[in-house]
Amino acid sequence: MDPLARAGLTERDMDIQPTPGDISEMHASTPHDGRYAGYTRPLRGITSEYQSLKRRLGLEIEYLIALGDEFQHYTGPRPRLIDTPFTDGERRALRRVYEDFSEVDFVRFKKIEPKTDHDVVAMNILALYNMGDIVDAAVMERALHFGRTSSDMDSNVFSLTVQEIVGKYYMPAILGLQRMFIGKAEEWHRVPDGYPRPFTVIAGQTHEQYAVPTPLRKVMANIATELDQALDSFIVRGTEGEQPFRLYGKMGGAVGNDCAMMAAYPGYNWRDFYRRLIESQGLEYQPATDQDESNMRVLELFDAIRRANYPLLKWGDDYSSYLSRGVLTRKTRSEVRGSSIMPQKVNPWKTEGAEVFLEFANAELGVYGRLARQRKQGDLTRSALKRYIGVPMGNIGIAIGRFADDLGRTVPNYDGIETELAAHPEISAASTQMILRAAGVPGAYDLLVEATKGKRVTPEMMRDVVQGLVGGGRIDEATGSDVVAVFTHERNIGDAVERADEQLGQAMETVQRLERLYGIPSSV
């Protein structure tokens, strides 16, 4: 047999040459940029060193422009640092320095940095070089980065980066997966024509043992509810109503007291200027800092992200079980091979791998508690952590993508569901016992134990038990009918339908609110 035919390919398909992107991915030092690049590629536009430098350069220039405006209000004893505000043309030209930041600029930065051994100094040298003669060079050299420490820029850049990760990468992914959970709850509830039940019911398990029947829709609604409760943390409620999560920004010098700026230009309310500048960047100004802000809010955000991973980990556990029990099955193409040696298998390898990526992410995000432990008034242990943020968030993105891949090709296995239900009529025993106890039958629990001990429980056996109770006058015909009815499993699900309706409605409402708050286009 032609080996390519097994994969649905031909010789013509093999006539290919690698693209530069292919070569980059095949030689990547980590799976993020290699095997899993399809899941993490959007992060490159947010967390790469190139983007970090561009964002830092942008903040330096916006600070410079704002400083030019602010000095028009300064009436203190010293000459103004910038005598007149920048013109509209100068502002546009200055902003183009960071808006047009290119790969060539990045390489130039890398040429400068080893000489200075300081990334912020190197960036400012490049900024001055690229500004050229936009405005007076002496003014630029005097005013750029004036009164600032590196952390005044880097702390804000990190907060902006994290907010962009959440808004453009994480939130669209997690809300998309939540929509899938909600959609599968509805889709899997429906049954094919001719099916003996009006909706899909499975045998619920507790402690890995068969317990009571439950609609598959309610199973999925519970997953959606757990995730919904975690996602609620991303809605910040205050006096101004609901808001997206906003991180802190800081500007206060080396130890948070703004010593350098206030020494140079005393008697001026620089804090109000910083607040307006930071808020214009989309952050909330935090004046109470040392070299960095406390990072408590970013840790709160990371805790929320970690919590949202736990419902996904539960789903990963359950998904494998539902497949192995035959409750769910995956649609596969004819050329798909689930195992290299066992032809009967189609392994849930994407979901199983997703669980590992989430465990990595939760462990990595836990390390970020170090952000709150800087030595004395400041050190650079935080710097490495901040550069690393794409790794845990990339792991989460990979996991969400893999969960979605498997979920999208999964359907109920109706034959397997019915086989399991027929093999385990004991899932009606709890309701049977309660009906008998309510009817006043003494020792109802022990009666059922004795009737079924050591035997394979069948609906016919239970009907015999009921008929014996009716014939012996221990229960009336109506009670006997109620007992028999619970062996029709869709009639023995309590208020599951109503609860699922409520839960799924609440979960979808949260999705829509988060989409509005974070500016995410609705997928429906």
Locate each region found by the language model.
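A conserved active-site cap/scaffold subdomain adjacent to cofactor or substrate pockets
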Residues: 290-396
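Active-site-adjacent "gating/activation" loops or surface patches in catalytic cores
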Residues: 267-295
